[in-house]
């Protein structure tokens, strides 16, 4: 048992050493053929996004668009439970499916709105913590308005039936539009481009704030 334990400790130490030696590669997306991959920041995973929503720092909606298939690879913060979510309702901390992010989702799709409540309760805790980030604040302000579905329909990102409900047969990248995964761009005028980037999935300062937040728990 002792030898097995030592092997496990040595393996863990070697893995940590290897990770630390490659910190400069964290978050850099590379390709094997047409398949993207990256060394992930801790407490993060990847998702394939179907919709990009652009807002400003005050949480005002600017633009929505469908994500091109060759740009869907997205780094997102996760919790231990949301990272292994299958059929449960565990919300991701920031980017997620429409039913989690859209407070007006039940106006267009048969849904009880519980996923939105779970998501917002979790996001509020990050927003109120000392590890909040400007992008987290902007997204929280925007989603409180409960207008995401309306905004995306106005931009013709989502399509409706004649009765105003969301069209069931419409897809984005082959995914039912009602199940689309959303990521955010927060347009910043207060920070030079050399310090940060507007895309949440590429912002190292946002990754670091989430890592600090998770470690504080």
Sequence positions of predicted segments:
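Conserved phosphate-interacting/catalytic interface
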Residues: 1-217
């Amino acid at each position: 048992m002792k030898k097995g334990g030592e092997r496990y400790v040595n393996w863990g130490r070697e893995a940590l050493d290897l990770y630390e030696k490659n910190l400069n590669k964290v978050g850099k997306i590379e390709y094997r053929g047409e398949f993207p991959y990256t060394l992930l920041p801790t407490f993060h995973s990847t998702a394939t996004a179907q919709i990009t929503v652009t807002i400003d720092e005050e949480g005002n909606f600017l633009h929505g668009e469908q994500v091109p298939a060759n740009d869907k690879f997205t780094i997102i913060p996760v919790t231990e439970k949301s990272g292994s979510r299958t059929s449960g309702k565990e919300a991701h901390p920031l980017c997620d499916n429409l039913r989690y992010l859209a407070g007006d989702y039940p106006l267009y799709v048969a849904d009880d709105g519980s996923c939105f409540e779970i998501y917002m309760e979790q996001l509020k805790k990050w927003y109120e913590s000392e590890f909040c980030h400007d992008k987290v604040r902007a997204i929280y302000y925007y989603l409180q308005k409960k207008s995401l579905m309306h905004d995306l329909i106005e931009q013709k990102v989502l399509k409706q039936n004649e009765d105003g409900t969301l069209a069931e047969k419409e897809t984005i990248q082959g995914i039912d539009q009602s199940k689309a995964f959303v990521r955010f761009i927060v347009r910043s005028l207060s920070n030079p481009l050399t310090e940060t980037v507007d895309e949440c999935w590429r912002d190292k300062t946002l990754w670091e704030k989430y890592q600090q937040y998770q470690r504080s728990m």
